[in-house]
Swiss-Prot record:
This is Inversin. May be ubiquitinated via its interaction with APC2. Hydroxylated at Asn-75, most probably by HIF1AN. Changing residue 498 to A: Abolishes interaction with APC2. It is found in: Cytoplasm; Cytoplasm, Cytoskeleton; Membrane; Nucleus. The lineage of its organism: Eukaryota, Metazoa, Chordata, Craniata, Vertebrata. Strongly expressed in the primary cilia of renal cells, especially in the varicosities, swellings observed in the cilia. Localizes in the node monocilia and in other 9+0 monocilia, including those of kidney epithelial cells and the pituitary gland, but it does not localize to 9+2 cilia (at protein level). In adult, it is expressed at high level in liver and kidney. Weakly or not expressed in other tissues. The gene is Invs.
Length: 1062
């Protein structure tokens, strides 16, 4: 084939016809072109090549000679900076090289790789070209280095040309020059798999058989022996190790000797050779403590292992982690090596563990070699051996998901209920690896899918952490709970949201995972918070669509709930405080009422005494100066005793009736006796007893009251000679004497008890009553009654006179007061006695408190007044009167008595104001209780769910209307009664002002107008019959719905006027 066609077919482009003529060897055409255009002799194509170069490539010596004669440049370079001589040396064309060298070609010219024609000439087997170049080169130019710092000798060793090496060494080439990798020509000569490389090695070693040359290490620490062992060239290894200076145990940078490489590569013969020529007698180990036997066992070279085990210097030593070559072989699943070692070494411990507690079975289970596991189990390997992490081989298999190994171990007796040092079970490790099949196998072997480790994490959380959907599905299909929290409060949804596994989140929510579970730490993050922190936008959107909340939203909701609960607590607390306040006011009102009754009794006694002094001062003087003569008891008086029949006394029967005129005609009575007998009438009992007091209070005990008609029957014949004037004087003196005796005379037995005659020896002398008798009038002391019997004649006469006296409170029979007629000159107190309970309350304070005055409180008030008079320094009395006698108040100066009365009035006025406020509070409280009771009654009706509110409002309005009308009709109007004439308007205004001022001090606002608003009438019939309205005094009903408020409807008038009507 024509060369031009060959060049063109290969894609070369000739720049001109001169290149074509050079390639084709058309010498005539080439000369014509050059003659016609001399510049064409060095014309370059696109590769920078000249016609001369193409002549070299095409082996056109004639054309080349013609171009050289025409003046072509012999050292012209192409784009790779190569000349025609480089191309001739590369092709090994001796003729062209000789032609170009004779034309003064530059043999030191370097191309882009810095290679000279000398480097290129070493690749050919013939040394002629190399010898031609060496003839033209100086002695120092033979070691010219290329870009990799390699000389021609390096290339000769690399191409395994021993003749070239001898020729270069003969021209003084340096055999110890390292290249860029630190290799000398011996390294390149030993790095041959061809056994003929031994000649090049010998050629170099013969030139300089030094120890440094044999043990020269490159920059990776490898000697020529390392390269010879790596290539498995037994001949070169034999040559190298034949020198005594060769170091067989030399380490490279990986701390591996030539024996390690021979064992790793499985060169059994080289291993045997090296073991035999190892003069040290020890087997070196690498940086990990592994011996060549470890490498041979790991690489599954049974023959090599056999060579090692058969050598007496080899032992199965452990590496730095305590692992033997047997463990290495088990970890790699090298059953042949294991069988070889078990057969050759009978003392091998199959259960030997490394420093982490792992055995050969651990290594085999971790790698998943079922055959190796069976082999070890057949050789009595311990199936439940634990390492330092308390992992058994089954744990390793579950972690890596080796299903066959797991089943083999379970069949071999491995326990499935063990946990490691962190509390992880086999199911935890299977879930961490995402092995759904392994999880199913373990669950079938009765492992709880909700088992928790020491941190509280479940296998489901481990699977959610890795986003293993299949494993999560298997666990939840086997009743794994997705809402279990670990000790930090995280659930499986927390881990899935943290890592952004949307599919896992969907799966968890499908199995009823709670999306708002909070952590237990300080942040209290929810799964949505983890998604927000990780900026998982798709997860955030999906969680929000399924009702997920962040911790900030939950805190807002919790704050709202807490505020609502706190408001309810404050309302209940205010209710309890107001209730306690009202109960305290109620107790204060009761105390004030008791004190008021006591002061009222004192006031009445003082008014009676003042009235007596104003109406009859001379008579009081006479009665006080007249001697009291004892009168013997009369048989008629003894026989005229009658039993007073007790009965209920009217509420306002305190009017003092005039005595019967027949009393003045009693025989055997002198004026002194008459005044003395009449003076035992108790003024205090007349004025201060309760209006509603029953006859038992008047007549209980051994000394009950005697009806005044007993005087008419027994003493009418004895009082014939006595004038009416003397009788009146005696009666007035008797009244004065009773005032002097004070409260002691009020408690003296006046007449015989009801139902039995009085004893003749009964003592009638006045005595001071004890405190217990004053406080408990309904429990008379029998010992005092027996001790009060008469022991002398004077006492009997006194008792007889007391029997002839009428009862202070009057008899229960309507006709018992016929003989008693009030005198015209008696005190105004007896002329204006209150007629009813309401008028009496108006006289006291103008407030209907609903509590009647106590008789004992009145008596105690009178006694207090008596003690004040006796102890006053202004009266001049050093000591009180002796027991049985009373001091006459008329003996005191008028100014002193007025001062005492004024002081009592001021104190009672202050008490009256307090009592008014307490009465208003009591009325409000009773109103609230009544409304509450009515609301409870109305709710007991069995009505429909829709009609309950309307019917309740109608019934409540009707009841309130009826009740208010009954109260307005039946409440008696209070009449102000007093002995002194006062302005009604002034008294009522003062009372009203005192009432509102006290309430304003308590509540801070006026209570005017409360309970006086009309309620809209209803046409519904009455559902409750009000049997007794008068018994509920001072109670004004209001809207029953207001009872839920905590002010007990004590609202200011501005609010009460605007309240809605039913």
């Amino acid at each position: 084939m024509n060369i031009s066609e060959d060049v063109l077919s290969t894609g070369s482009s000739l720049a001109s016809q001169v290149h074509a003529a050079a390639v084709n060897g058309d010498k005539g055409a080439l000369q014509r072109l050059i003659v016609g255009n001399s510049a064409l002799r060095d014309k370059e194509d696109r590769f920078g090549r000249t016609p001369l170069m193409y002549c070299v490539l095409a082996d056109r010596v004639d054309c080349a000679d013609a171009l050289l004669k025409a003046g072509a440049d012999v050292n012209k370079t192409d784009h790779s900076r190569r000349t025609a001589l480089h191309l001739a040396a590369q092709k090994g064309n001796y003729r062209f090289m000789k032609l170009l060298l004779t034309r003064r070609a530059n043999w030191m010219q370097k191309d882009l790789e810095e290679m000279t024609p000398l480097h290129l000439s070493t690749r050919h087997r013939s040394p002629k070209c190399l010898a031609l170049l060496l003839k033209f080169m100086a002695p120092g130019e033979v070691d010219t280095q290329d870009k990799n710092k390699q000389t021609a000798l390096h290339w000769s060793a690399y191409y395994n040309n021993p003749e070239h090496a001898k020729l270069l060494i003969k021209h003084d080439s340096n055999i110890g020059i390292p290249d860029v990798e630190g290799k000398i020509p011996l390294h390149w000569a030993a790095n041959h798999k061809d056994p003929s490389a031994v000649h090049t090695v010998r050629c170099i070693l013969d030139a300089a058989p030094t120890e440094s040359l044999l043990n020269w290490q490159d920059y990776e620490g490898r000697t020529p022996l390392h390269f010879a062992v790596a290539d498995g060239n037994l001949t070169v290894v034999d040559v190298l190790t034949s020198y005594e200076s060769c170091n067989i145990t030399s380490y490279d940078n990986l701390f591996r000797t030539p024996l390690h490489w021979a064992a790793l590569l499985g060169h059994a013969q080289i291993v045997h050779l090296l073991l035999e020529r190892n003069k040290s007698g020890t087997i070196p180990s690498d940086s990990q403590g592994a011996t060549p036997l470890h490498y041979a066992a790991q690489s599954n070279f049974a023959e090599t292992v056999k060579v090692f085990l058969q050598h007496p210097s080899v032992k199965d030593d452990s590496d730095l982690e305590g692992r033997t070559s047997f463990m290495w072989a088990a970890g790699k699943g090298n059953d042949d090596v294991l069988r070889t070692m078990l057969s050759l070494k009978s003392d091998i411990d199959i259960n030997m563990s490394d420093k982490y507690g792992g055995t050969a079975l651990h290594a085999a289970a971790l790698s998943g070699h079922v055959s190796t596991v069976k082999l070890l189990l057949d050789n009595d390997a311990q199936v439940d051996a634990t390492d330092v992490m308390k992992h058994t081989p089954l744990f390793r298999a579950c972690e890596m998901g080796h299903r066959d190994v797991i089943q083999t171990l379970i069949k071999g007796g491995a326990r499935v209920d063990l946990v490691d040092q962190d509390g992880h079970s086999l199911l935890h490790w299977a879930a961490l690896g995402g092995n759904a099949d392994v999880c199913q196998i373990l669950i079938e072997n009765k492992i709880n899918p909700n088992v928790q480790d020491y941190a509280g994490r479940t296998p489901l959380q481990c699977a959610a952490y890795g986003g293993y959907i299949n494993c999560m599905a298997v666990l939840m299909e086997n009743n794994a709970d997705p809402n279990i929290q670990d000790k930090e409060g995280r659930t499986a949804l927390h881990w899935s949201c943290n890592n952004g596994y949307l599919d896992a989140i969907k799966l968890l929510l499908d199995f009823a995972a709670f999306p708002n579970q909070m952590e237990n730490n300080e942040e209290r993050y929810t799964p949505l918070d983890y998604a927000l922190l990780g900026e998982r936008h798709e997860v955030i959107q999906f969680m929000l669509e399924h009702g997920a909340l962040s911790i900030a939203a939950i805190q807002d909701i919790a704050a709202f709930k807490i505020q609502a609960v706190y408001k309810g607590y404050k309302v209940r607390k205010a209710f309890r405080d107001r209730k306690n306040l009202l109960m305290k006011h109620e107790q204060l009102r009761k105390d004030a009422a008791a004190k008021k009754r006591e002061e009222e009794n004192k006031r009445k006694e003082a008014e009676q005494q003042k009235g007596q002094l104003d109406t009859d001062p001379p008579r009081s003087h006479c009665s006080s100066s007249a001697p009291v003569l004892p009168c013997p008891p009369s048989p008629q008086n003894e026989g005229s005793k009658q039993d007073a029949t007790p009965s209920k006394q009217p509420p306002a029967s305190h009017t003092v009736q005039s005595p019967d005129p027949e009393h003045s005609r009693l025989p055997g009575r002198c004026p002194g006796r008459a005044s003395q007998g009449d003076s035992s009438i108790d003024l205090q009992g007349t004025a201060s007893r309760k209006p509603s007091e029953t006859p038992i209070e008047h007549c209980r005990g051994p000394s009950a009251c005697v009806h005044p008609r007993s005087w008419e029957g027994g003493n009418s014949s004895k009082n014939q000679g006595t004038s009416s004037v003397e009788k009146r004087r005696g009666e007035t003196n008797g009244k004065h004497r009773r005032c002097e005796e004070g409260p002691s005379s009020a408690r003296q037995p006046l007449c015989t008890g009801s139902g039995r005659p009085a004893e003749k020896g009964e003592d009638s002398s006045p005595a001071v009553a004890s405190a217990s008798q004053q406080d408990h009038p309904r429990k008379p002391n029998k010992r005092q009654d027996r001790a009060a019997r008469p022991r002398g004649a004077s006492q009997k006469r006194r008792t007889h006179q007391l029997r002839d006296r009428c009862s202070p409170a009057g008899s229960s029979r309507p006709g018992s007061a016929k003989g008693e007629v009030a005198c015209a000159d008696q005190s105004s107190l007896h002329r204006h006695t209150p007629r009813s309970k309401v008028t009496q309350d108006k006289l006291i304070g103008g407030v209907s408190s609903g509590l009647p005055l106590s008789t004992e409180a009145s008596r105690s008030g009178c006694k207090q007044l008596y003690e004040d008079i006796c102890a006053s320094p202004e009266t001049g009395v050093a000591h009180g009167p002796p027991p049985g006698q009373c001091m006459n108040i008329h003996l005191l100066p008028v100014e002193q008595r007025l001062l005492i009365i004024q002081r009592e009035r001021s104190r009672k006025e202050l008490f009256r104001r307090k009592n008014k406020a307490a009465a208003v509070i009591q009325r409000a409280w009773r109103s609230y209780q009544l409304r509450k009771h009515l609301s409870r009654l109305l709710h007991l009706k069995q009505l429909g769910a829709r009609e309950v509110l309307r019917c309740t409002q109608v019934c409540t309005a009707l009841l309130l209307q009826v009740w208010r009308k009954e109260l307005e009709l039946k409440f008696p109007k209070s009449i102000s009664v007093s002995r002194t004439s006062k302005s009604p308007s002034k008294g009522s205004s003062a009372t009203k002002y005192a009432r509102h001022s006290v309430l304003r001090q308590i509540y801070g606002c006026s209570q005017e107008g409360k309970g006086h608003h009309p309620i809209k009438s209803s046409k519904a019939p009455a559902v409750l019959h009000l049997s007794s309205v008068n018994s509920l005094q001072s109670i004004h009903l209001d809207n029953s719905g207001r009872s839920k408020k905590f002010s007990y409807n004590l609202q200011p008038s501005s609010q009460s006027k605007n309240k809605p009507k039913l």
